[in-house]
Amino acid sequence: MNDETLREQTTAESEETSPTTPSPEPEVVETLPLIPLEGAVVFPYIVVSLTLDELGSASAEAAAREGRQVLLAARRPDAPADAPITDQLFNVGVVARIEQLGTLPNGASGVVVRGLVRAVLGEAVQTTPYLRFRFTRRPDVFERTPELEQLMVEVHAAIDAVLELRPGVTQEIRNFVRSIDDPGHLADNTGYSPDYTFAERQELLETFDVSERLRKVLMFYRKQFALLEVQAKLRQEVQESAARQQREFYLRQQLRAIQKELGEDTSEAAELDDLRQKLAAADLPEVARKEADRELSRLARINASSPEYQMVRTYLEWLAELPWNKYTGQPIDIAFARQVLDEDHHGLQKVKERILEYLAVKQRRAALGEENLRANREPILAFVGPPGVGKTSLGQSIARALGRSFVRMSLGGVRDEAELRGFRRTYIGSQPGRIIQELRRAGTADPVILLDEIDKLGIDYRGDPAAALLEVLDPEQNHTFTDHYLNLPFDLSRVLFLATANTWDTVPPALRDRMEVIELSGYIEDEKVQIAQIHLVPRQLRANGLRPEEAVVTEDAIRCIINEYTREAGVRNLERSIGAVLRKVARRLSEGEIDPANTPFVVDAAFVRAALGRPRFTNETRERIDQPGVAIGLVWTPVGGDIIFVEASAVEGKKELTITGQLGEVMRESAEAALTYVRSRARSLGIEPDFFETHAIHIHVPAGAVPKDGPSAGITMATALASAATGRLVRDDIAMTGEISLRGRVLPIGGIKEKALGAHRAGIRTVILPRRNLIDLDDLPPAVSAEMTFIPVDTLDEVLSIALLPPATTTDTLTVAQRSDVLTPAS
């Protein structure tokens, strides 16, 4: 043992005193105590201090007794704790000499060691009470070739360049690195760079070839140099920017001091004072005032050239310009409100009555005091109806009756929640949402805000705008509405919200629950004539530069436009057409074709046809229903009621049913049910027993480009099928609607009022409908009820007995008067 230890000491001394190239010698297997290292790598030639655990301390004490040489090897970080000790350690370590062994101030054992030479571990000889391993020494073996010398020069240069960029590196350290002439020593000394990871250090230790080790070091330091060069450039830019800002700040402070001495004010100081005055005049709530004061103090400390200065300034300007406590509403006068509604809108009596009731309740509750007003909040009114029936103008009339500002906020196509609630101030270009923007534009905290086209809100990955409206329209929450940009509560409880929609089905249920629906149906012809004479014609005369004494539009001309050019539920296209006609008059007056002495120029039906061209709509009912297999049905659409033609045809051939016209699933099922019922009644209808076995049935609903669905065409399809199978014509003065069951029962459907108005517009005055829908006729205008006949039915047999003409009868030989004895007016 003494001989072995002596040989180890001699070898170590030889390595330390002669770092020149050793001669290759046969590998000698030795044994030494081993200290396992946690997350550390020791290189040859390096002196380090280590903290020891119990096992390492025992190994160090054994080594000190035997000759002060010890093995050092790092543990593998991914090795299981219960694995054999040989599997826990890297197989390449270092032989080191213990320079000092003792106790650290914290009571743990410590040791100072000097690395001597690399070692390749063998098997464990002893594991308790300390570790002892077999190993072989792996001294550096190299030949000083020109290539190696050039490699050392490049490594020296790379290390020197990195040290040059590192702050705090002394000249003494640079000189020490330059003085290292041994290639292996040079490579190993770099292993303690703080930029090396544990894995990179172990990889460097396991590289026995000196040239390869130097190449790895060179590659590493070149990467470090590139990284440090970028960091140095960025650091220099930051320092220059900071120095420039500091210099500007110093100069500005000097300029302020000089201007103050001269009695001059600076623009920044003036801006701050102006903002303070605006914020003081804005009558901010306590929470908003504290936030404004905090942001003002912050603004005073920010350089005016900084982007943050503009962001804070814009935010404070928003706070100053919002109408926090500005109210313009007048006490509600119900008589004045009725007068305004009657002036602005013709008809709509039930709608006006509901609005007046709504305003009366607000008036009574306002008289009871603010506390009661907050305790029981009224619902939000939603006007639902076809385009052009006056939904938006009703909101304007309500605002005029209340003496408030009117704001129309179109929601059609809005898909981003932030459009309503605003963008947070962390984003560049952020701003408040449209609700806060409209309040600033209105200049008052109690305007009438009309949420137009609320049924056309969209939804995508940016959020659900309908969900954002829940807080806005909820009377229990909107007194603390928080916009993302302001990040402050704003009281919306005094705002009168109204909404409009063409259809109620697409509005989310939670949003529907917060609103009360007021339905507006389409206008009948007489109402349109009155609206045109009172409102549309005078407005279009002014719009086209005509005086009332220069042009007169007759009632016949208006009816011509209604019936032949604008078959619609509302009056929007009617106004456009009147404008188009009056533009022709204005041009003729300007060109001298009309003698001013002969004014007023009378616009009659003939002039309308000449101005607007070929009529867009004609009464084609008789032409389209002059063959068996065609029946007239009624449909409801978002733009009002209308008629449809259902066609059925029976062709000799294979038994099958074909359905065309882009019909939905419900309509297809109605067609199948209608066919089944007609087949079941074949004998009573006089249809041959094998007719449906030898004929292919085709049902078609024209306007194939328009999707159609719903159950209300059931009796129409059954009537068309019965007509096609029997060869009997369907009456051309009757339209029908109703769902059919397999037993021939006629079931109730919806949209009766709109469908009846659609039939009236199309010139049809007799309608077959389910008996259980008679109650819906109470909503019809009296003028329509007086002109139309409604026939309630319970079964399809009743429908067929009324709608089908007798065999061999044509629509030309049977007059309406002769048919009237079949019909019974609705009771």
Swiss-Prot record:
Induction: By heat shock.
One GO-annotated biological process of the protein: protein quality control for misfolded or incompletely synthesized proteins
InterPro entries linked to this entry: AAA+_ATPase, ATPase_AAA_core, Lon_bac, Lon_bac/euk-typ, Lon_lid, Lon_proteolytic, Lon_Prtase, Lon_prtase_N
Residue numbers annotated as active site: S712, K755
S-S bridge residues: none
EC number(s) given by UniProt: 3.4.21.53
Pfam families named in the record: AAA, Lon_C, Lon_lid, LON_substr_bdg
Residue ranges annotated for the Lon N-terminal domain, each copy included: 32-225
Record's keyword terms, sorted: ATP-binding, Cytoplasm, Hydrolase, Nucleotide-binding, Protease, Serine protease, Stress response
Protein's cellular compartments: Cytoplasm
Record domain Lon proteolytic: where: 625-806
Function noted in UniProt: ATP-dependent serine protease that mediates the selective degradation of mutant and abnormal proteins as well as certain short-lived regulatory proteins. Required for cellular homeostasis and for survival from DNA damage and developmental changes induced by stress. Degrades polypeptides processively to yield small peptide fragments that are 5 to 10 amino acids long. Binds to DNA in a double-stranded, site-specific manner.
PANTHER family given in the database record: ATP DEPENDENT LON PROTEASE FAMILY MEMBER
Name listed for the protein in its UniProt record: Lon protease
UniProt source species: Chloroflexus aurantiacus (strain ATCC 29366 / DSM 635 / J-10-fl)
Gene name of this polypeptide: lon
